[in-house]
Each structure stands twice: as structure tokens, then as C-alpha cells.
Amino acid sequence: MAPDVAPPVTAPPVTGEVPREAPRDLAALHGTEQTRTYPCNSCGAELHFDIKLQKLACAHCGAVHDLSVDLTQSAVEQDLRTALEALQNGRLHGQRSISAEHKEIVCQNCGGHSTFSGSLTAERCPYCATPIQRDDVHNAPDRLAVDGVVPFQIDAKSATSVIDEWINSRRFAPTEFKTYNRTGSFSSVYTAYFTYDADTEATYTGRRGDDYTVTVGSGDDERTETRTNWFPVSGVVTNSFDDITVFANDGFDRARVAKLEPWPTQTAKSYSPEFVAGHLCRTYDNDVEQCMGEATTKMEAEIDQTIRRDIGGDRQDVDSRIIDWRKMTYKHLLLPIWLLTVIYQDKPFQVYINGVTGEVQGARPWSKVKIIAAAVIILVVIIVLIVLLKSRKS
């Protein structure tokens, strides 16, 4: 079976961009043979993670290599308090941090950070479609290590079909948007997420309200009113949370990215660079401490619901609650997104595809010319119909 080679839009990418034309020589951006992470045993060219085969494949000679990692090994949870102490005390170096062998691209236009290993073959920033310059490449700083990855399941051909269908269904989209393969950047990108686990015990005080009805008034003014008896309550409730996900990147439409959920985080494999070979990885912009607030907000909302269920009755009024957080762990995961970025009238428009489920979310520009043309056509049709009706009456 021929390997699935990620096809590029504007450039020949073995790094995740989707090709529409024959690859060009990008030797200026390539590392030496010694810096290549996974050279092919057959020809020496660089291997990439083939999404369709779920193996390492060579786009040059077609050779396929099994992954060296244990595919049955799941991502391991890490102690949250230990990570917070390391971040606060600046002790990431020498701890569980991303290897210094990684290189990092920092886009000069949008500030987006991406990491890669071995050779870089992407020509455009996946987030704003700005051409990548050699000065954009730096050594990656120390960051919390990646614990797991959910590999791409939607390959380049399928992703292209999905995005074409989505774009073609957008009426009044400008031609520049529909010809994204010439004007945009379409890339396979692993985005950064933190997942949080915790066991909680919440002690609360409050009031329980039981409704009852009474009849008041007389005659024509007789009516039924609902009243409430309130009783003081207190109690203890427990909750267990698993994989509360928080998106750790900036520069995306977070509301649209949230609609790509749910993610099958339970299928996350223990991280190995083999899974991301040939694809870009977005490093986190917000660390595990900065993302924790969003996670605890989600958990507290569920705890409040648990308290209200425990109080019972028709109405609940919570006066106080004290939460004891236990067994707090996290995972730093890479989750797969096909990212289309098209610049239209100097504004970037992004479309996202969940690389596992194929769910599509995105923003599209509107063509004023097409809208005006459609309005004119409708107006002409209305005028013609009016003229025909008048001619029939006469």
C-alpha cells in the first residue's frame, strides 16, 4: 500500500501542509542528514508520520516503517502541585521539559509559536499564512513536557475533501477564499491542551425551598399563588473529575475550537516524536497554571449542580461552600487539528477540522460583489414578474 503523503497547498510540505502541486526543492530550509530525526533506512530521506497507515513513511521511496513506540501505552497523568512548584520556582530545566533538540518557529507577523524536529519544509505560518523566514527559527525554550498525543485519524485527502465541501457550501464567499489552495495555508497542526483530574469534597450550607400553593382573594379576584417554605440545610458532597480539557493556545477563535469537542482524550498515546514527525506542533501559550482557572471554573460549576441536587426541593439557595481539592493531576496533550488560514482583505480567516472526528468549524468572509449581484438579479426578476402581471391584466 502506498504511503499517505500529506499534500501541500502552496508548498511541498512533508510537515503537514496539503499539496496540490509537485514538491519543490526546499534545501535552504532543510537540516543536515545528522539533524534529521527519522531518516529512511532505504534511501536516507526523512520519514513522516503517515496518518492513513499510522506508521512512519518515506515520501521519497515509499518505504514504510513501524513505529518503535508501544502503542498500548497510554498517556500518564502528572502531579499538578509538583508542576506548579516547578513553574513558580523556575525549575523546569532538568525536570520533565521539552527537549532542547526541538526547534521553534516564531512568526514575525502573528507571534505564533510552533515546534518541529529535524527538517522544516513548511513555507507559510499555519496561523496567519505569512511566509516563514529563516530568522523565525530558534532553539525551543524549556517547557513542560508533552505527556501524550492523540494521533491524526483524518488524512490529508479526507481533510481536503471535507474542507472543499465546507467552503463550497458557503454562499457568497469570495473567490479568493474558495481558491484557498493557491492563497492560503492548510496544515496539519498538533495543538496544545491541558487536561485536569481531581477528586473533590465540598462542605456547604444553605437553604432548601419547598413550594406550595394557596388560594387568596375571593369572587372575581380569587387566584392561586405559589409560596415557598425555606429550611436550613448543610451537607457534604463528593465529585470525581477526569480529563477536563482546556485549550492552551492563543490566536485561535476559542469559541469555534471549543465546538470541535469532544476529544477522545482517553485514547491518547504516550508521547513520542514519531507521532508528530512531518507535522507542526503548536506549543502552549498558557501553561498548566494559567489554564487551571478555566478548569476549576468548569469543575466548580459541576460541584454546584451536585450541591443543588443534594439539597433537593423545588428551590436551592447556597450560602457557602468550601472545596477540598484532592488527587489533582494533569496531562499535557497534543490534539490534532487541520487548520486552514486564508488572508482576505488583510484579515485572516481560519477554518478548523477535528483531526479525529472530522468536525468542521470556521469563519468565512463575505463577497460584497456577489451579494450585490444576487440582489440585482432578484430585483430584476421581481420587476419582470410585475411587468408580466400587468401585461396580463391589460
Predicted stretch roles:
Residues 99, 142-343:
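Charged, low-complexity helical/coil segments in non-catalytic cytosolic or luminal regions
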Residues 47, 65, 114, 132:
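Cys/His-rich microdomains that often coordinate metals
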Residues 335-361:
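Extended, hydrophilic extramembrane loops/domains of integral membrane proteins
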